Amino acid sequence: MLTASQKVLQQLAALLLERAGLKITPDGFHSLRLALSARMPVLGLEEPEHYIQRLTGAGGEEELRSLLPLVTVGHTEFFRDAKQFRALEKSVLPDLVSRSRREMRKVSIWSAGCATGEEPYSLAMVLAELGALSLEVDLWATDLNLAAVEAAKQGRFTSRRAISINQARLTRFFKPVEEGYEALPALREYIRFDGQNLAVPVFDKVALSSLDLILCRNVIIYFDLPTIRGLMDRFLAALRPGGLLFLGYSESLFKVYDRFEMIEVDGAFVYRRPLNDKSMRAPPLRITPYPGEPDVAARRPVPADAFTADLRKRMLPEDVPLTTRLPAVSASSVAAPGSPSVTLPALGASSSPRSVVPGRLPAVSPHSPLPAIAARSRVTAELPTVGSVDSARPRITTELPAVATTPRAPTVEVPAWPTLLPPAERLAMAVRKMAQGDFSAAIAGVQRLLADEPSDLDGLLTLGNLFSLTGRIPEAREAFAQAIQREPLCVEARVFGGVAALQAGELSEARSELSKALFLEPTLAIGHYLLAQVHERTQDHEAARRSYRNAIAQLRFPQRPLAGHYPEMPDSADAISRAARYALAALEEQPLR
């Protein structure tokens, strides 16, 4: 492997932090050495210092784009996180399509950090199934890695990557090609792919308050705290009031950023720009035109573009003008308490409190008695309007005689969303108990989490590990089985299942579980390391040496963090490499070089 000084690695880490917001600690310097070994020969460079000069000189931005995929994990999949996509399919996207049609505009969505495109294609399939046309949708998918963006544009996926797409969707939206499937042109029309660095201080392609939905999942785990906060400021400014932000399942803004409000949608926790947030309203930034689109200043005003005209034609009869779509509401009209509930207003839309009352309440006229008051037999008229409150005045009861004065229009207090602790934070509390050696409290904490979130993958894996550490092997097996039931391709359930079996002395089971994990993810270094330990226990020293060497060899590939938590398991590339080399040296009875 290339030899690079600590100073060069620190300079490279500082550049990645400054230019891309990536925080790489000394534990991750092994991945930087691997990246240098891969990029320097391509550029014809022999000294790491010259590579640093290339990054900081002309053409440095282009080289940065080539470097980043080597130090980050671009793992993604179709319909990733079933709970979030259930919320998108059942509530979020249907509401956005309906609302955008009412407002005669496009649904505006940003898939930020889209990698090779599985996420935006998943969104496009759902939108198509909801009946949204491609011309009704502006689905912008971006990534810093331009090679990944180009691959996403092609829409080609191997059979293994397409495994989570059901057969009906494969038949409708893809055509079989060699070694996999290719998205049909009709599906690709929904998406426009582009390069975008999320760490830049200004998004010059995004207008203020223009987006309905942003998905930025499993991206901010690579960023340092200032970069995350700056990115959240820009996301908040880009979303419409009431717009939603989806982060990765294990990502939380708890004690990081408090300007979003967290809400629950069909079991998924998401972040929302407050409805009454006016702090970001300002003259919109100039939007970069799409390729081939005339500049904003060069566009000639037209009474109605083709998009709006098409929507009018499909949504309204030709003889009905737009202004007659909704009936006029008379201020004096009276609705009985049992009348149908009022339709909720669109998010961010203003409405008079006399015509629309938030929540499912009966329509109420300003001049009709409140239902609760009208039901009281001893009151024959409404209470008078009250000015200032006199604390010395005795409390008013229903025994007061009727007062014939003009009543106030009723108001309804809508309770604020409760402050909810996200699953990731609840799990972190249990992990702290585990670190303190309080396993009973840790188990109880994770079990309470799973009572509320029964399919929480991190929780299931951590609970299995807690059972394993406390000798409750059958319960550990059950927890890992539930994790596999939720995610059939869950590598971690196989890895931790192998560890539990190893602790119980079930070496055949341990070998089987770890082999299954490596079948699913052959480059997982920790899997090879643990399998080597199983071989050592069975006295198969040759197989153990081979597995330790495999663990070291796989470190040339980026290693992702495992879901779930197991204390003191080597997790960084350097830690795995060091442990494997020591074990290998001990087996070979040779001193470390």
From Swiss-Prot:
Enzyme Commission number(s) of this protein: 2.1.1.80
Keyword Methyltransferase: yes
Enzyme class: transferase
GO MF terms held by the record: protein-glutamate O-methyltransferase activity
InterPro entries, per database record: Bact_Chemotaxis_MeTrfase, CheR_C, CheR_MeTrfase, CheR_N_sf, SAM-dependent_MTases_sf, TPR-like_helical_dom_sf, TPR_rpt
Residue windows of the TPR repeats: 423-456, 457-490, 491-524
Known catalytic reactions: L-glutamyl-[protein] + S-adenosyl-L-methionine = [protein]-L-glutamate 5-O-methyl ester + S-adenosyl-L-homocysteine
Residue span(s) of domain CheR-type methyltransferase: 1-276
Record keywords: Chemotaxis, Methyltransferase, Repeat, S-adenosyl-L-methionine, TPR repeat, Transferase
GO biological process: chemotaxis; methylation
SMART domains to which the protein is assigned, alphabetical: MeTrc (SM00138), TPR (SM00028)
Classification via PROSITE patterns: CHER, TPR, TPR_REGION
Role according to the record: This methyltransferase is one of the proteins required for the normal aggregation of M.xanthus cells during fruiting body formation. It is also a component of a sensory transduction pathway that controls the frequency at which cells reverse their gliding direction. It may methylate FrzCD to form gamma-glutamyl methyl ester residues.
Protein name: Protein methyltransferase FrzF
UniProt source species: Myxococcus xanthus
